[in-house]
Amino acid sequence: MIQSQINRNIRLDLADAILLSKAKKDLSFAEIADGTGLAEAFVTEALLGQQALPADAARLVGAKLDLDEDSILLLQMIPLRGCIDDRIPTDPTMYRFYEMLQVYGTTLKALVHEKFGDGIISAINFKLDVKKVADPEGGECAVITLDGKYLPTKPF
């Protein structure tokens, strides 16, 4: 039976335990996701408390991380999503995304509405991918793909 969580702390505590086990075992998120049939980003999102994993995937990652049965069950429960505090992020990486939306948010909104009309980009029917690519000027760049279904506003 599908179960749901009403308290974000239990999943955040589990995420802390998962990250500790991941570090002790020297595993990458890609290695943990391997064999689940799910995207690395989706499995990572679940391990950090923002998604529910199917039972088979939860058992597989649970075995890789030496999680107990209760933790494996928690990974399958629908979480209380959106655990970022209602304040400006202080973590430098998360702040840069906040900053990007502050700078480019109105541009993204204008371009999306111009190309699609009034509506939103789904965060439910959504895919996320992060790639590291060489910068022709030296160093490396992050290519972040946000792929969400467009949902038009419907008058009623």
Swiss-Prot record:
**Organism superkingdom:** Bacteria
* Keyword list, A-Z: Lyase
What the entry lists under CDD domains is as follows: Cyanase_C
One Pfam entry name: Cyanate_lyase
Catalytic activity field: cyanate + hydrogencarbonate + 3 H(+) = NH4(+) + 2 CO2
One BP annotation, GO: cyanate metabolic process
Checking InterPro entries in the record gives: Cyanase (IPR008076), Cyanate_lyase_C (IPR003712), Cyanate_lyase_C_sf (IPR036581), CYNS_N (IPR048564), Lambda_DNA-bd_dom_sf (IPR010982)
Q: Where is the active site?
A: 96, 99, 122
Entry GO MF terms: cyanate hydratase activity; DNA binding
Q: What is its EC number?
A: 4.2.1.104
Q: Where are the transmembrane segments?
A: none
Q: Which SMART domains match?
A: Cyanate_lyase (SM01116)
Keyword Transport in record: no
NCBIfam families assigned: cynS (TIGR00673), PRK02866.1 (NF002773)
Known role? Catalyzes the reaction of cyanate with bicarbonate to produce ammonia and carbon dioxide.
Family, per the entry? Answer: Belongs to the cyanase family.
This one is known as Cyanate hydratase
In which organism is this protein found?
A: Escherichia coli (strain ATCC 8739 / DSM 1576 / NBRC 3972 / NCIMB 8545 / WDCM 00012 / Crooks)
